[in-house]
């Protein structure tokens, strides 16, 4: 009903606009077209792009008569992955009145680039500058594309350097790769070994470059030194291809000598940047452009699946996931994991765990990375015995010097702790600290476990103080150190910490319970009962805790 009202108001406002008299409107427009157009806008604003597209298509009569129609229609087409259709619509319907948006000229520039008509591409790009409107990222896109066009036309890198930090450096690496510049290796190495950011993704493209130039042994030497457990999906897949002696797989999906391939990677970078800022709509827009330029690189669609998942659009997530099959082990496993997450949201955690465990057992000789994932799935589902079984497999397959050795011990040790096997738990956690003595979360977990058992309280407090010095904004560590002070009867200090933990994690039942206990000890009993009562309302409160809280609400702390 509300949507109908808005549609009526919008139509009324449009009819009364000084730009169009009622007579002019009746001559050139149809109220049905207007209704569909505004319905399209509403659907678009609600992120229902498929529905928006239907409405826009049914109101195409307005395409040359309403300034923003073409812009909304084009944006929706691209969001639906129909980039070529968007380009066609722009070509057929662009006028001086409806062409005042950056993306129209960008798409035309890219279409000309695809056809290697670089002069025409530059003309469209030049026009796009008129509509940047102080949007810094649009300016970066235009300037970077301008530099790529210079490389493609002149076969040399522009002497005019743009100062966009590592963004510019990444693109220069690809430009040098395209030119097969003698310093390409140096540039790739400088990029992937950067101390400031994680640019491990570009190892994949360096491997691609080496294989293209017949340097397979060097590529293999690089992947031999990569750890599956510590590598991204893309790097893991590349490592597997080399182990399986399938270097041709690299060439099938990307080539530095192909202009559209490297520009496609640039737009993936833009998309990834938007996604990291939770701007999923713009991320999807540029990701679809990236995929249009290089549809062979289907692995980039994993970001599109993640974006849809975060927006709770599970239907589109599942559709994208069908792009991945068993031939590419790691992306197939990504598909199964994401499906399991969707099942968890829609059908519950038990069905999700059944699904992932069943499909895991169908995989022959799963990678250690996949074993690690299935262990974590079971641990998170509180199936600790199953999790320990998988952690045992991992520990038997990795060297003690592996960067993740301490992490696996921590995960196995915490699983033992949840089962009440404190001997094995303490052994694993202490050994993990031998490997990484400054790992705050392990210090916190072991110390808190000891506090719960009222064991080595003084040492626990020292460990927690060390953990807090390393991560003083972590709510779990703040709660633990506060609870340690509670156990040694320093309630003032305890309250200072736990109060902050409650502020950081207001929905956590344990933190609220702890705060209630401390307030009771400080003789602030009405407040204590308030926080205990709050625990009963929280979604994550377990049954045993509810029973304990109900007793506290009746009797208070019986040892007070």
Language-model features, listed with the residues they occupy:
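N-terminal leader/linker segments that initiate helical-solenoid repeat arrays
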Residues: 19-73, 79, 87-88, 100, ...
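Residue-level recognition of tetratricopeptide repeat
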Residues: 41, 75, 110, 148, ...
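Structural motif corresponding to the intra-repeat A-B loop/turn of tetratricopeptide repeats
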Residues: 46, 80, 115, 151-153, ...
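Alpha-helical repeat scaffolds
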Residues: 53, 57, 83-96, 119-131, ...
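Short coil turns that delineate tetratricopeptide repeat
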Residues: 64, 98-99, 133, 196-197, ...
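TPR alpha-solenoid repeat register
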Residues: 69, 104, 138, 168, ...
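Canonical tetratricopeptide repeat
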Residues: 72, 107, 145, 171, ...
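Terminal, low-structured helical/coil segments at or just beyond the last alpha-helical repeat
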Residues: 254-264, 509, 514, 521-560
């Amino acid at each position: 009903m509300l949507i109908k009202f808005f549609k009526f108001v919008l139509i009324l406002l449009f009819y009364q606009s000084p730009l169009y008299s009622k007579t002019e409107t009746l001559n050139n427009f149809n109220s049905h077209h207007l209704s569909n157009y505004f319905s399209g806008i509403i659907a678009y604003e609600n992120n229902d792009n498929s529905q928006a597209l239907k409405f826009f298509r049914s109101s195409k009569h307005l395409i040359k008569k309403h300034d923003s129609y073409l812009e909304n229609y084009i944006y929706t087409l691209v969001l639906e992955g129909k980039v070529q259709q968007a380009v066609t619509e722009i070509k057929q319907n662009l006028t001086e009145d409806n062409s005042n948006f950056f993306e129209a000229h960008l798409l035309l520039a890219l279409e000309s680039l695809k056809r290697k008509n670089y002069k025409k591409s530059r003309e469209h790009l030049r026009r796009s500058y008129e509509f940047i409107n102080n949007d810094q990222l649009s300016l970066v896109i235009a300037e970077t594309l301008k530099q790529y066009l210079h490389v493609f036309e002149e076969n040399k890198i522009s002497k005019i350097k743009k100062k966009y930090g590592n963004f510019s450096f990444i693109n220069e690496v690809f430009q040098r790769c395209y030119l097969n510049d003698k310093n390409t290796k140096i540039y790739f190495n400088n990029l992937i070994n950067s101390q400031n950011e994680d640019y491990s993704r570009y190892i994949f493209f360096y491997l691609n470059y080496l294989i293209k130039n017949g340097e397979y042994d060097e590529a293999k030497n690089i992947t031999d030194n990569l750890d599956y457990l510590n590598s991204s999906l893309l790097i893991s897949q590349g490592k597997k291809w080399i182990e399986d002696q399938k270097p041709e797989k690299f060439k099938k999906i990307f080539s530095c000598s192909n202009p559209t391939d490297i520009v496609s990677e640039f737009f993936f970078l833009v998309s990834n940047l938007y996604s990291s800022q939770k701007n999923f709509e713009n991320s999807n827009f540029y990701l679809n452009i990236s995929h249009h330029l290089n549809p062979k690189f289907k692995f980039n669609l994993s970001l599109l699946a993640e974006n849809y998942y975060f927006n709770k659009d599970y239907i589109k997530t599942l559709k994208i996931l069908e792009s991945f099959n068993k031939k590419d082990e790691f992306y197939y496993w990504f598909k199964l994991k994401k499906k399991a997450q969707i099942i968890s949201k829609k059908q519950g955690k038990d069905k999700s765990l059944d699904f992932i465990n069943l499909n895991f057992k169908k995989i022959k000789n799963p990678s250690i990375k996949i074993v690690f994932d299935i262990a974590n799935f079971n641990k998170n589902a509180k199936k600790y015995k199953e999790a320990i079984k998988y952690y045992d497999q991992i520990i038997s397959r990795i060297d003690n010097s592996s960067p993740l050795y301490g992490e696996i011990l921590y995960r196995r040790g915490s699983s033992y702790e949840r089962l009440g096997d404190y001997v094995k738990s303490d052994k694993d956690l202490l050994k993990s600290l031998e490997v990484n003595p400054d790992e705050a979360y392990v210090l916190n977990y072991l110390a808190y476990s000891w506090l719960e058992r009222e064991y080595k309280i003084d040492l626990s407090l020292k460990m927690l103080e060390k953990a807090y010095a390393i991560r003083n904004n972590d709510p779990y560590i703040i709660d633990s150190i506060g609870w340690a002070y509670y156990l040694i009867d320093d309630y003032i200090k305890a309250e200072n910490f736990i109060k902050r933990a409650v502020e950081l994690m207001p929905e956590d039942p344990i933190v609220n319970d702890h705060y209630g206990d401390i307030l009771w000890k400080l003789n602030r009993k009405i407040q204590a009962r308030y926080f205990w009562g709050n625990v009963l309302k929280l979604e994550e409160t377990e049954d045993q805790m509810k029973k304990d809280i109900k007793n506290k609400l009746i009797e208070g702390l019986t040892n007070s």
